[in-house]
């Protein structure tokens, strides 16, 4: 099993291109099931999660072709027909977002059998809201032996969908299912994340009639069919925020290109409050910290445009060496402080009580062997390793490979001493 080793102490100086958003790309890939014409996605990240979903889509009848073009990395998806409505456990378990093939399959072919998902083990994260949305659109849902059986032989029907609480995944799933439904669907209490706007833009380019994404109310007027399209995936705001934190942690000057700083205003405001410099550019931003120690600041996670829960672990790593005490409140997921004990192995002073962590900054972290527990926790350990004295080795980095493209290459190009150690012990520089 691969590991990543970091020798701390080097500043970061250079340019990091931000990849396309994983959380958007995987939903856009699922949209290919809705049409018999090709869907071309540009600015596509190459990640374990997109590979997993590509395998699943291939099984369902989608022809998946990756290439490099003038618009960067591209993926062409073409499903002239759905050859199977069965999404097995061995594929769906690898990534919970692959469950979102259920709605498109039912919308286009009238039936599906999809395994209940796996993925990051952060809290309960039930799929109940997804199923309620598909049922509201007229599908008959049965659960049996870990599988969801969904049928709508006469097609889906437009409906009012009211979520009791905000769910990004359920909102996306409802949008994917409703675009081919007969009539008008209205999603109330919809999530407002920018990835939903990206999904709306792609679906509309394919001929759908979706409006309101990015607001709490999304309206979808069903159409008989969708056609092919070309769509550029939005930049990954979590990757952007992660490298912004890494630059503030290690010091130096890092330019983030192909980025949209407005998507992470909540984080950038906190970086400035802590003492880092943030300068917006035509295609991104520049993060600087020139030697001065950062000051501890408090954060509380919240739905967009608030502080993203997917950046909480990274910010906790940043606060481990800040001057003073910071309080970090997690309001989105329970059990999302699993990275805290691993940061403590590096010398961090952290105490956790319920949904709040207190981080008392220390003068110096010390390198050690640590273990990634989930996707965002894994990169927080890499960030801490950038300043830890000596070598930090992070194991179980398959979590990292799910969401960060060429991380060692991007950090290494800015001066970080980071390398991948292959499962047989051989380092990959």
Curated annotation (Swiss-Prot):
Belongs to the EPSP synthase family. MurA subfamily. GO terms for biological process: cell division; cell wall organization; peptidoglycan biosynthetic process; regulation of cell shape; UDP-N-acetylgalactosamine biosynthetic process. This is UDP-N-acetylglucosamine 1-carboxyvinyltransferase. It comes from the Bacteria. Gene3D superfamilies: Enolpyruvate transferase domain (3.65.10.10). The active site is at 120 (proton donor). Keywords: Cell cycle, Cell division, Cell shape, Cell wall biogenesis/degradation, Cytoplasm, Peptidoglycan synthesis, Pyruvate, Transferase. UDP-N-acetyl-alpha-D-glucosamine binds at residues 96, 125-129, 310, 332. Phosphoenolpyruvate binds at residues 22-23. NCBIfam families: murA, PRK09369.1. HAMAP family: MurA (MF_00111). One of its GO terms (cellular component) is cytoplasm. The modification 2-(S-cysteinyl)pyruvic acid O-phosphothioketal is found at residue 120. It is an enzyme of class 2 (transferase). It is found in: Cytoplasm. The gene is murA.
């Amino acid at each position: 099993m691969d590991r990543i080793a970091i020798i701390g102490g080097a500043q970061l100086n250079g340019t990091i291109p931000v990849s396309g958003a994983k959380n958007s790309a995987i939903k856009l890939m699922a949209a290919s099931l809705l049409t018999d014409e090709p869907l071309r996605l540009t600015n596509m990240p190459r990640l374990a999660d997109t590979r997993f979903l590509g395998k699943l889509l291939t099984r369902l009848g989608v022809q998946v072709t990756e290439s490099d073009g003038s618009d960067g990395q591209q993926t062409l998806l073409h499903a002239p027909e759905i050859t199977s409505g069965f999404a097995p456990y061995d594929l769906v378990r690898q990534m919970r977002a692959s469950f979102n093939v259920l709605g498109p399959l039912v919308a286009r072919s009238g039936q599906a059998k999809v395994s209940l998902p796996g993925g990051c083990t952060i809290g309960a994260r039930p799929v109940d809201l997804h199923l309620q949305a598909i049922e509201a659109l007229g599908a008959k849902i049965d659960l049996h032996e870990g599988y969801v059986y969904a049928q709508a032989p006469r097609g889906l029907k437009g409906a009012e969908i009211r979520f009791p609480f905000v769910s990004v995944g359920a909102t996306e799933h409802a949008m994917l299912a409703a675009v081919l439904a007969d009539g008008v669907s209205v999603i109330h209490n919809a999530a407002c994340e920018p990835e939903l706007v990206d999904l709306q833009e792609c679906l509309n380019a394919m001929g759908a009639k979706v409006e309101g994404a990015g607001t709490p109310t999304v309206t979808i007027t069903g159409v008989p069919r969708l056609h092919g399209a070309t769509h550029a995936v939005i930049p990954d705001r979590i990757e952007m925020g992660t490298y912004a934190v890494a630059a503030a942690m290690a010091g130096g000057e890092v330019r983030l290109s192909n980025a949209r700083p407005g998507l992470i205003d909540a984080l950038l405001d906190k970086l400035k409050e802590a003492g880092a410099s943030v300068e917006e550019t035509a295609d991104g931003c520049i993060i600087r910290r020139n030697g001065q120690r950062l000051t501890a600041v408090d954060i509380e996670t919240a739905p967009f445009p608030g502080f993203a829960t997917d950046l909480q672990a990274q910010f906790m790593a940043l606060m481990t060496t800040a001057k003073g005490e910071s309080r970090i409140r997690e309001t989105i997921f329970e059990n999302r402080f699993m990275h805290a004990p691993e940061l403590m192995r590096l010398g961090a002073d952290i105490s956790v009580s319920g949904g709040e962590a207190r981080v008392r900054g220390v003068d110096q972290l010390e390198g050690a062997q640590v273990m990634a527990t989930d996707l965002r926790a894994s990169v927080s350990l890499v960030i801490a390793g950038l300043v830890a004295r000596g070598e930090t080795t992070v194991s179980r980095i398959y979590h990292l490979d799910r969401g960060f493209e060429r991380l060692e290459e991007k950090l290494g190009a800015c001066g970080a001493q980071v390398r991948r150690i292959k499962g047989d012990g051989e380092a990959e520089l």
